[in-house]
Amino acid sequence: MGQKVHPYSLRVKINKDWKSKWYFDKKLYSTILHEDFLIRLEIMKFLKGIKFDISDIEIIRNNPQKVTVVIVTPRPGSVIGLKGSNLEKIGQLLTKKISKKISIKIKEVKRPELDAQIIANGIAKQVENRVSYRKVLKSALSTSMLKGAQGLKIKIAGRLGGAEIARSFEVKEGRVPLHTLRANIDYGFSEAHTTYGIIGVKVWLFKGEVLGRQTNSDAGQVINKKPFRERGETVKNFDKILNNREKINEKQTRALNKKDGLSKDEASLLNKLSSSFSKERVDSNEQNIGG
């Protein structure tokens, strides 16, 4: 059911970040959240003429009495206005609404063809201007794919072309892996207000995988400690271990092998050396007694 879930909700802190960045006591949570909603609503109302060029509005709160608003747009000049007049008016409007100090910043979108929200806004604007929705969708699809998108899916729903029965129409090109969490999926939604009613536009844009596919050569295998020789042990220490194992049983030997971090091959070699060493010592003792 990945297609039913907002792509951002699954990918926060994987390859997406929160659009509102703040932390407050749970008693104030609903109040602050409502303030965020009002801020976004008032900005969109004020910039109604250029609302189709706004990609996102980020809100940052470092202290309770100051709010930093970041407006993300491909046309900073239109938002700023003549000598910053628009920003000043927005600041005054928001201060009056929420009675807090407002700081407004502008962030430019350098590649609007690869921004899902701007694509959705552009489609909605053209549909409102009575351009054929099929033509609009195909044009948006080809433009984004040429600019480097790895996959794009656009869905439009409502009374398309003035039809009496509402329906949906969808176009897709490339890969859009909604179930892959490492996939960087950008999502945008917009509404076209026509004489027939509201037509919804949804856009899913696949920009590539943010976290590379990681494969381990030892996947599914038991990982042993480093071999005895790789741990910098000397031959003297090896001989010392050999001498200590002359008079112990099999169970104790296995326990010591595990403690010393020996691999199966090393333990087998050590057992053989231990048995041959013991045999040589017995033979030499017998010769001494006989002599």
Curated annotation (Swiss-Prot):
SMART domains to which the protein is assigned, alphabetical: KH
A GO CC term assigned to this protein in UniProt: cytosolic small ribosomal subunit
GO biological process: translation
UniProt-listed Pfam families: KH_2 (PF07650), Ribosomal_S3_C (PF00189)
Keywords: Ribonucleoprotein, Ribosomal protein, RNA-binding, rRNA-binding
Family: Belongs to the universal ribosomal protein uS3 family.
Subunit structure: Part of the 30S ribosomal subunit. Forms a tight complex with proteins S10 and S14.
Protein name per Swiss-Prot or TrEMBL: Small ribosomal subunit protein uS3
Organism of this sequence: Borreliella afzelii (strain PKo)
